[in-house]
From Swiss-Prot:
Monomer. Catalyzes the reaction from prephytoene diphosphate to phytoene. GO terms for cellular component: plastoglobule. SUPFAM superfamilies: Terpenoid synthases. The gene is PSY. This is Phytoene synthase, chloroplastic. Pathway: Carotenoid biosynthesis; phytoene biosynthesis; all-trans-phytoene from geranylgeranyl diphosphate: step 1/1. It comes from Narcissus pseudonarcissus (Daffodil). The lineage of its organism: Eukaryota, Viridiplantae, Streptophyta, Embryophyta, Tracheophyta.
Amino acid sequence: MVVAILRVVSAIEIPIRLGFSEANWRFSSPKYDNLGRKKSRLSVYSLYTTSKYACVGFEAENNGKFLIRSSLVANPAGEATISSEQKVYDVVLKQAALVKDQTKSSRKSTDVKPDIVLPGTVYLLKDAYDRCGEVCAEYAKTFYLGTLLMTPERRRAIWAIYVWCRRTDELVDGHNASHITPSALDRWEARLEDLFAGRPYDMFDAALSDTVSRFPVDIQPFMDMVEGMRMDLKKSRYKNFDELYLYCYYVAGTVGLMSVPVMGIAPESLAEAESVYNAALALGIANQLTNILRDVGEDARRGRIYLPQDELAEAGLSDEDVFTGKVTDKWRSFMKRQIKRARTFFEQAEKGVTELSQASRWPVWASLLLYRQILDEIEANDYNNFTKRAYVSKVKRLAALPLAYGKSLLIPLSLRPPSLSKA
């Protein structure tokens, strides 16, 4: 039985800002402690001082667990709506449940499922995966090198996911982006449903169709990425971070949810699957926020501003200031706040990377370390992301690889003694 109690509170009643999973408290009920139950966790999500209203939800379960989450927000008209983080959290729970169900139903490796039936010879599927690997090597060299440490089955599955994500992104950000319409995205989504049903259209689809038949991957993150492309077609401003968070989830956070079922959680890990997926989501959010901060000038020249409008206003800035592209003290202050937020998501992500299967950690660590350096470069450019593109030199990129490899060898955070938990 679950009891839900909701009340709307004003932002004045919330003196602190809490990001995604940034704070956890222990709450125990003497009644349930006497029954020998474990003390449960109290989690608080996305309560922003900049929001006019927040709706806090308390849940009490029959095991004595009490949860508080920002599942709803109230708009100025007084209408209650689901917050972006809660929408995403529901997808995380679904994906984590799929993995748990797969683990319970079969202790066998996900790598031993038979190939899907394809027209032609069995070599067609191998060729499809090989071509995916070539695309990954061409456009994501560092990440590709990291995947070479993974098992062949996991490696080629990650390549297939990468290629689908790249093709999807190219629809609205490639050479033919100006010709893409909502109906074209509808057709792409229908094609996605077909490949999940084992009806691929081409060799790249065939690779992904085989991948989703082998691993407990849900279609929802893929559908959500297509939704992110739709958002790009019709939206060029984001009034607050809640809106921007949802966009970041659609176009990048989804990648983490697609990848974890393939990369796998370390058998020895004591972490809950949900926490690992949350961390993967955080890495996607962090990467996209970093992309946004790096490309402010480039996006502005396209008439787009992927920055929270309310936070720009709080800093005394406007769209015109972004289009003018002059670095001022106000801009520096605003950027410091945005960079701090991105780093918070990177910190959240680090906790989950250690829980992945060891062979899968290196490419993820490499991505995390390299993207985080982009934030350092923005600072080194004195926050001029209007005319200077933050670029991590080849020397620094190469230097990050052995560091990433070293981190990939560490035992999962859930197994470390407290004295080593920050290593």
